[in-house]
Structures are given as structure tokens and as C-alpha cells.
Swiss-Prot record:
Name the record gives this protein: Protein FdhE homolog
This protein's record includes keyword Cytoplasm: yes
Lineage, highest ranks first: Bacteria, Pseudomonadati, Pseudomonadota, Gammaproteobacteria, Alteromonadales
Protein family: Belongs to the FdhE family.
GO MF annotations, alphabetized: ferric iron binding
Any single biological process term in GO: protein maturation
PANTHER family xref list: PROTEIN FDHE
Biological source species: Shewanella baltica (strain OS185)
Length: 301
């Protein structure tokens, strides 16, 4: 059972062709689609075992998204930027409860080496978990033990993605500016998605935590915003479903997923399945400006 703060809804346009600055996700649908996509991609992947671990994890996320107790959303002002970035200790108890449920459900499904890591994580103090969760949400991934990050982020993702749709309904989208980080929770995107609704060819960035999407103009760097020196890369041809857009100014890059051509794609799963593209760009001196919830890579210094 969940409760929302009593904040007036912001009227929106009824036009089906109106560009939506923010799009809310259905967490259950996202997790179910992601699990199915991971199963499909694992068949031809050298990372099949890891894909299967992620599939089981995401399947539990879907179950928790449907059944868990999320408490009550903290009150916030509708003019506040990134409202879900402000959640504090009250939220910690809920996502940490989700973490314990997630680990308990996953524990019988993994081998002993992973089970040892999970049992150790289950023994951590609430204060330590709060600190690690805060570091991850702020993008300081290297401050958290690498073997714990996947599970902590998964639990936080279930909590933040539950509240994001209700928060978006209460945000004044007219005030949402083009930005590199999620306007709802302040976290990094996973990748860009190119969609066919409400109009073909629009680009949205997909949040790595709350699963929301926000509009970002194409051919602009999603990190520094410049639009002069951008390059598109792909492994096979110019019509590839996964491409990379790199910036010669800041040397950052983000992947673009053309879901308008392949609706079964999932940003996290397909990003994981195309790590060879990342290797190519890293070798050329570019660095990802995104974060994959299924692969919490430590930031470079």
C-alpha cells in the first residue's frame, strides 16, 4: 500500500502530438520487459551467466514493484528541482527493507560465491547502507564496494521508480529544462532512446534509477550541451539499432537506442549487450557519461 503527498496536479496538454518534456515509466512493465530482453540477449552472449544473474535480479524487482510496501511519499514543493533527490533518512528505511527482500529472494538462485557476497551485504548496518546508497545516487560509484553496488542500486531503483510517476504528475513540466541529469531524481541516464511517439525521431534520456525519460535535443552533447563537433559511431552500418554519439569537446559519449525500430529493446540490457562499442570508444579516448544499473562501473579519475 502506498500513499502520495497531497499536492495539486499540474494541468497538461491534451494534444497527442505535444512534445512531453518528461515521461513516466510503469516500473512493473519496465522490469518485465528488461527480464525478457536479458533472456533473449543471453543466448548469443559470452556473458550469458551474468545476463542470467541480472535476469533473476530484475524479475525480483518486478515482483517487489507489484507487492512491496513503499510507505508514504515525503512532501515536497512542486517548484523544487529534482524532487526525488531530496529524499533522506525516511526513504532509507524503505529501500533498505526492499534490499533485504530482494537478497532473500535471490539468495537461493545463485551460486555460493555470489551468495557469500549477498550474505555479507545483508549484515551491513543501516548507517553504512545509507552512506553507500547516497554515494551511488550522487555518482560516486567508486566509494562503494563493487560487489555490492548492483544489489544496492536494484533496491533503490524499485523504490525511486515507484514514486517517480506520481511525482511527475505534480511537476510543472513547463519548467523542465534540457539537462544531463534526471529532472526527477538527479541521477545519470543509462542511454538515449529514439522513439516514434508522440512524434518520430524524438530523443529521450532514460534514467538509471527512477526509469523516467526526459527530452533532449538530438545532435547535442548530453553532457556538455555543445552541438558543433559530434560524431556518430556504430559497429556495422549507419542504420544500426545501437549507435554511439561522441563529443569532441568534452570527450564524453552516450549510446542511442533506436527503439522506434525495435520495440523489444531495453536500455540497460542492450547497453550491456554492446560493451564492445564502449571498448572501441574508450580506446579512442572517449568516456561514457552514463550509468548502467546492471553494470556499476567505477568512475575514472
Amino acid at each position: 500500500m502506498s500513499h502520495t503527498a497531497e499536492i495539486p496536479l499540474v494541468p497538461g496538454s491534451e494534444s497527442p502530438l505535444e512534445l512531453k518534456p518528461l515521461k513516466a515509466a510503469d516500473p512493473q512493465a519496465v522490469y518485465h520487459r528488461r527480464a525478457h530482453r536479458l533472456l533473449s540477449l543471453a543466448k548469443d552472449s559470452p556473458l550469458a551467466d551474468y545476463f542470467e544473474l541480472c535476469r533473476r535480479l530484475v524479475s525480483i524487482q518486478a515482483k517487489l514493484a507489484e507487492e512491496a510496501d513503499f510507505g508514504q511519499l515525503l512532501a515536497w514543493g512542486k517548484d523544487e528541482a529534482t524532487p526525488l533527490s531530496l529524499l533522506g533518512s525516511e526513504a532509507d528505511s524503505y529501500w533498505q527493507g526492499l534490499l533485504q527482500q530482494l537478497l532473500s529472494d535471490l539468495l537461493p538462485q545463485v551460486d555460493e560465491s555470489i551468495a557469500r557476497v549477498m550474505r555479507l551485504l545483508m549484515q551491513q548496518s543501516p548507517e553504512q547502507l545509507s552512506s553507500w546508497g547516497r554515494s551511488l545516487r550522487q555518482g560516486h560509484v567508486s566509494e562503494v564496494p563493487a560487489h555490492f553496488s548492483l544489489f544496492i542500486w536494484a533496491a533503490m531503483g524499485v523504490y525511486w521508480s515507484h514514486w517517480a510517476p506520481m511525482v511527475i504528475k505534480r511537476m510543472d513540466q513547463r519548467k523542465v529544462a534540457q539537462q544531463s541529469m534526471c529532472p526527477v531524481c538527479g541521477c545519470h541516464p543509462v542511454a538515449s532512446v529514439i522513439v516514434d511517439q508522440p512524434r518520430a525521431g524524438l530523443r529521450y534520456l532514460h534514467c538509471s534509477l527512477c526509469e523516467s525519460e526526459w527530452h533532449y535535443i538530438r545532435a547535442h552533447c548530453t553532457s556538455c550541451g555543445q552541438d558543433k563537433e559530434m560524431t556518430i559511431w556504430s559497429l556495422d552500418d549507419a542504420q544500426a539499432q545501437v549507435r554511439i554519439e561522441s563529443c569532441d569537446e568534452c570527450h564524453g559519449y552516450t549510446k542511442m537506442m533506436f527503439v522506434e525500430n525495435s520495440p523489444s529493446m531495453d536500455v540497460a540490457a542492450d547497453d550491456l549487450a554492446t560493451l564492445m562499442l564502449d571498448s572501441e570508444l574508450n580506446a579512442k579516448g572517449f568516456g561514457a557519461t552514463t550509468l548502467n544499473p546492471l553494470l556499476m562501473a567505477h568512475e575514472t579519475t
